[in-house]
Amino acid sequence: IVLSFIDGETNITVNGEDVSKEIRSFEVNSNVSEISCIEGVRKILVKKQQEMGKNGGVVMEGRDITTVVYPNADVKIFLTAGIDERAERRAKEFSEKGTDVPIDKVKENLKNRDFIDSNREASPLKKAPDSIEVDTSNTTIEEQVKLILDQVKIIADKKRN
């Protein structure tokens, strides 16, 4: 497994094959929680993620980034949104990539993932106590970016002083 950055995007190759698009498919999304429960898989992925950011200056998203992968990160943001909003966004994402998935199916998938990921033993989905929660339910992407950048600036200013 090789993770690389090309034109601001994360590219993932497995045994030399680019799987960057496939990894975000509905089929993978429907099965990812079952695989992520396997402790050996978690250990390998956490190690890879930690290697990516060993020199700092990295922004990562994931369900255990602030609690397991980078528990000492300078800035920890915990994004939330209502299930209906999340389902709508994910269905739109799939549609833009050429796969139409009914919203009710996407919503059920998200609920299932949330339950499995929140209750797994290895690297469960939970909010780090020192993370900043940002509810994105009723905000545009531009507003979300501004909210997060404002928090980054506040933390950076505190570190300088």
Model regions: which residues?
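ATP-dependent NMP and nucleoside kinases share a basic, alpha-helical "lid"
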Residues: 20-29, 36-97
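Short, surface-exposed, polar/charged, turn-prone segments marking secondary-structure boundaries
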Residues: 39-42, 63, 86-89, 104-108, ...
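NTP-dependent small-molecule kinase module
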Residues: 13-23, 29, 91-97, 116, ...
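Small-molecule kinase domains that catalyze NTP-dependent phosphoryl transfer to phosphate-bearing small molecules
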Residues: 4-6, 49-55, 63, 68, ...
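Translation machinery proteins
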Residues: 1-12
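Generic surface-pattern signal
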Residues: 1-2, 33, 37, 54, ...
